[in-house]
């Protein structure tokens, strides 16, 4: 059974203690306060029953690392202030059975503090009016790959971080209208072989908003970082970067069933760190008209993968600096309105080329899917000998070719116009 605790300064021990107010309902007897134990925020590996904070409290954390295996619930519009003035960034470990559960109040952390999840420890902010404020918030797992600690913001809960929020939990979730994580920089990743995989789902109206940067993966990490945006969830930042073993997924991660798309709102998405190539954008959703308007950039030659697995996604940014690889699977469709840089395209699904006026498409295309010229005048100038699918030219659109290699062995279905500008003799034997 949960008990309601109150914090009391212990002069002899020079620390805060948690007292349980045990009230007797027996007629004629007075309630009495009993000091259960000195559950101090300054001791390590302490044990206590769950603590409920239902009135305003202020705690000085100190410089020593601390570990708790009980649940602290903040409710009834209470305000809990934790002052962490030591610049060494002390660590609060939420061990198995422990967690910070903000369900109806506010927690403010003044100064640097690391949250470490061990076993099944958790950090939860749920329900409208529940908020966590911090200058910096480093949320990390315990370094064990099998830990099941989790991070959850749901049902209108909010986290506000002035500078950097670093997430390295095994599982994370931001879900529900009004649920937000707001930070200067939002980072997911671990150094080298430390920690397990990081996974965060932003869904059903939940949001992750960074004023400066969303960063996925670390340059030499050996674990995987996955950020999934689905079912109307939203991430926003001026820049999103993908480093080693990182995946930004619209709908669902690769290998999972497609879901409704979310929203990726960014000015630039950049693939970084040239020594590794395992970084990708996954398009795996059920929408017919999803859009990514960011400019997609390869920080070094050949970096990055764009994999269209399910649904139709239009890339409407200036992607001239992208030099990675594009894969369109049988149930996927990818639309290009400006360019896709110098990327090579393996098309087993559908490639939509949609020009407002004119477009020169010099990319090398292979596969047996469909190239659809939807609008404008599109000049196919690349070496597409390995393409054996179909080329559809919509009514009002114009496809321009100059050599036989531009259309490979494709069959053609022309409702608009096919313009051939040949500067040498060649046999046109495409169906």
Predicted regions and their residues:
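Extended active-site and interfacial segments that coordinate phosphate-rich ligands
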Residues: 32-34
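Extracellular "spike/adhesin" assembly and maturation modules
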Residues: 2-28
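Beta-strand-rich extracellular passenger or scaffold domains
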Residues: 47-431
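Short, Lys/Arg-enriched charge-dense amphipathic segments
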Residues: 29-30, 260
